[in-house]
Amino acid sequence: MPRVVYFAVAFLWAAAVGPLPLKGAETKGPLSFDELVEYFDSIVFQSEIQDVQPSRVVKKWTQPLRVAIRSFEEVLIEKDGREILRLKQVKVRKPHLKFIKKHLNSLIKATKLKTEDSKKTGELPNFMINFVPRRQMGNPYLAKANPKLLKRLASEGGCYFLVWADGTTGKIKSAIIVVNSERLLIRINHCLLEEMTQALGLPNDSNRIEKSIFSDRSRRTDLTRTDLIVLKTLYDPRMKVGLVRAEAMTVAREIIRDLDAALP
């Protein structure tokens, strides 16, 4: 699960598989109100990597998602007398499309975000999902990012995401998800839900509770009540993009109290 890396203003947010250290014992039952507030804070504003500054403002999507899905396989070509492995784009597998459609529908329902067809709007996709063989996960062709960072993110061999956001306004501009196509389908299904959820502005993991998409111990393929509270809190109209942490957490308490009372 995610490791998060921050850069200033041209702001790149990156995450790959790897757990957030526990602050305390795992909670088996439902979280209390105060624990839900703390959980939201840990997912949105804390940092998983030592010496890396956590996010200081609320970051989320304010524009429609234009989703594109690509799948690649390795091909061997000969160049200058040498054999080289390259990526070749192929048809996306039906199970992968099914997983993405299911998760996208769940996320759109929870956040009220809009989607657009980039072919109809003429605008480039801003939410790209790539399926590649494991050893190609760090291929610089997949994302315009530091090759060393891509290699680091790919080293876990599961999946990772990168998000570009404005460090001041908090508006997310684009996201790229890279998935190891050689994994078992059940792992890919979980991985897609995790990365798609976190690419919406919820970058961190927490093992505070096992029954959560944000837990390193989880292999869930649907969102729990706690997950929905966290996601809905971020995308509640009262949670303005760009709010600094202190203000955001004051607003979060109000929203979480309402959601905790309303959700079954």
Please give the residue ranges for each predicted region.
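Bacterial N-terminal signal peptides
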Residues: 8-16
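Non-catalytic architectural context of zinc metalloproteases
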Residues: 25-81
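Boundary at the C-terminal end of the N-terminal hydrophobic targeting segment
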Residues: 17-27
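A general structural signal for short secondary-structure junctions and capping/turn motifs
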Residues: 3, 118-121, 221-222
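Bacterial N-terminal signal peptides that target proteins for export
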Residues: 1-8
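Second-shell loop/turn segments in exported
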Residues: 69-79, 83-95, 176-187, 213-222
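Metzincin-family zinc-dependent endopeptidase catalytic domain
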Residues: 90-193, 198-199, 203-209
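Metalloprotease/metallohydrolase-associated module, dominated by Zn2+-dependent proteases
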Residues: 27-43, 49-52, 145-187, 203-264
